Curated annotation (Swiss-Prot):
It is found in: Cell membrane. It comes from Mus musculus. This is NADPH oxidase 3. The chain crosses the membrane at residues 13-33, 50-70, 104-124, 168-188, 202-222, 396-416. The gene is Nox3. Residues 55-284 form the Ferric oxidoreductase domain.
Length: 568
């Protein structure tokens, strides 16, 4: 089992462990530096350990804010993914988990933000207490520094009469910190799966608060409220001796009044590179959005599915890739991902869009396909296209055996792959590595995806004519059927074609037994590397991951299942 787990999970584990290790190192190193550094001795007198907690979490925040934009820079990831020299094997598959890493980094930002905020609330209160009338000793002496000429202050709170909330809102750091916190709350809460499923538009718009987040982050340290002793002051002012003789600071030559300065802001240095990279990403998207997209065909399918055929200058794709589509007449800002359902051999590229939210429903209305004939092509809404981008499905042809599994509308990514196989068979081209494809499709009603059943029928016919029927083995499972359908199916069971799908391969009714399926595939292909590709529900994804681990051989010479899930 450990070997089987390593096949599919080791890469993700190593990445997560490395990320955690860097965070731990930065936090611990910074924490102890601020705990022991002599320049911050007097600062610690006022703030105590909260100083180290605030600064350590700040460094980790800077590190994670540096990383957060990289996983969503699609063109950068596609560039790296296409560089086989830099990205091979299991590490290439990690690029397909970019959104998982994006979420992991976001959790890191959230955790460190909470630590940072709580620590600074303690700091603010302790600064405030330092100006209290009953404050005494070294604490009072340090808090009063800055009142006399030629003195620099250590305590940014200059009076006890003003409340801590007012003090917070009177500083650059306080205002920007509040803005950063609110932006983070909006972004995190709107990123829950429930919000993304029920109102993708809310998720999309609130995520663009990141612009305000990074601007506030860049100037957050400009207030320099955390101050330490200057190097010149440390040279003249012996902290070890002078801390016990604070009453003599004004008179004793050995203990001149300590001078303090704020630390130079550094957050912008951490974020500058990724922000510039992401700015280039958005410029590329803007440029692509203004390239002309010609809609050549519109087809309305059952169950509110819209098929669009398009052309665009210099558009080159590979099987399994996806694009982002914008329709300015529906929303001038929103971009939505859709997998390509056309093959590279075709002179157009296509997508199938199902109405499953406000934006897609509005798009279908814009094309007037709800119960009406498609619009004339000249009156079609303008579309902008960004992409294509590579996903995990692009690796189907890199395995000798590939198992493709889809549920419901998740079948669309496999249309391009199967079409590509179909064209290669038509052109008598060989598939260098791929020798067998197992395709599983689980849906409630095949009629809802009539277009895909037609594709399978064409593929089945062509491959049979070419004598390559052995290359593809497909299994359709229908989960939505009633008693009347069952009787109808039973009466026509002996017919050569399936009564529901019209295919030679009979459909199954219910759900597949994955233990039996994986056991049979492992038996059919001993000593093979088998790629398992899935697009569908999270629950089934967990089941398939478990099957890949369970049926991968411990023996390096045995069968190995490599799990890949399509993510947007």
């Amino acid at each position: 089992m450990p070997v089987c787990w390593i096949l599919n999970e080791s890469g993700s584990f190593v990445v997560a462990l490395l990320w955690l290790a860097v965070n731990a190192y930065l936090f611990i190193d910074t924490f102890f530096w601020y705990t022991e550094e002599e320049a911050f001795f007097y600062t610690r007198v006022i703030l105590g350990s909260a100083l180290a907690w605030a600064r350590a979490s700040a460094v980790c925040l800077n590190f994670n804010c540096m990383l957060i934009l990289l996983p969503v820079s699609r063109n950068f990831i596609s560039l790296v993914r296409g560089t086989s020299v830099c990205c091979r094997g299991p590490w290439r598959r990690q690029l397909d988990k970019n959104l998982n890493f994006h979420k992991l980094v976001a959790y890191g930002i959230a955790v460190n933000s909470v630590i940072h905020i709580v620590a600074h609330l303690f700091n603010l209160e302790r600064y405030h207490l330092g100006q209290a009338k009953d404050a005494e000793g070294l604490l009072a002496a340090l808090s009063k520094l800055g009142d006399a000429p030629n003195e620099s202050y250590l305590n940014p709170v200059r009076t006890f009469d003003m409340g801590t909330t007012t003090e917070l809102l009177m500083t650059v750091s306080g205002i920007t910190g509040l803005g950063i916190s609110l932006a983070l709350v909006f972004i995190m809460t709107s990123s829950t799966e429930f919000i993304r499923r029920s109102s993708y538009e809310l998720f999309w718009y609130t995520h663009h608060i990141f612009v305000f987040f990074f601007i506030s982050l860049a100037i957050h340290g400009g207030g320099r409220i955390i101050r330490g002793q200057t190097p010149e002051s440390l040279r003249l002012h012996n902290v070890t001796y002078c801390r016990d003789h604070y009453a003599e600071w004004q008179a004793a030559a050995l203990c001149p009044v300590p001078q303090f300065s704020g630390k130079e802001p550094s957050a912008w240095k951490w974020a500058l590179g990724p922000v510039v990279l992401y700015a280039c990403e958005r410029i590329i998207r803007f440029w692509r959005s203004h390239q002309e997209v010609v809609i050549t065909k519109v087809v309305s399918h059952p169950s509110a599915v819209l098929e669009l055929h398009m052309k665009k200058r210099d558009f080159k794709m590979a099987p399994g890739q996806y694009i982002f589509i914008q329709c300015p007449s529906v929303s001038p800002l929103e971009w939505h991902p859709f997998t390509l359902t056309s093959a590279p051999q075709e002179d157009f590229f296509s997508v199938h869009i199902r109405a499953s939210g406000d934006w897609t429903e509005a798009l279908l209305k814009a094309f007037r396909v709800e119960g009406q004939a498609p619009s004339e092509l000249c009156s079609m809404p303008r579309l902008a296209v960004d992409g294509p981008f590579g996903g995990s499905l692009a690796d189907v042809f890199h395995y000798p055996v590939s198992v493709c599994i889809a549920t419901g509308i998740g079948v669309t990514p496999f249309a391009s792959l199967l079409k590509s196989v179909w064209y290669k068979c038509c052109e008598s081209q060989s598939l260098p590595e791929l020798s067998k494809v197992y395709f599983y499709w689980i849906c409630r009603d095949a009629g809802a995806f009539e277009w895909f059943a037609d594709l399978l029928l064409s593929l089945e016919t062509r491959m049979s004519e070419q004598g390559k029927a052995h290359l593809l083995s497909y299994h359709i499972y229908l989960t939505g059927w009633d008693e009347n359908q069952a009787i109808h199916i039973a009466l026509h069971w002996d017919e050569s074609l399936d009564v529901i799908t019209g295919l030679k391969q009979k459909a199954f009714y219910g759900r597949p037994n994955w233990n039996d399926e994986f056991k049979q595939i492992a038996y059919n292909h001993p000593s093979s590397s088998i790629g398992v590709f899935f697009c569908g529900s999270k629950a089934m994804s967990k089941t398939l991951q478990k099957m890949c681990r369970l049926y991968s051989s411990v023996d390096p010479r045995g069968v190995h299942f490599y799990y890949n899930k399509e993510n947007f």
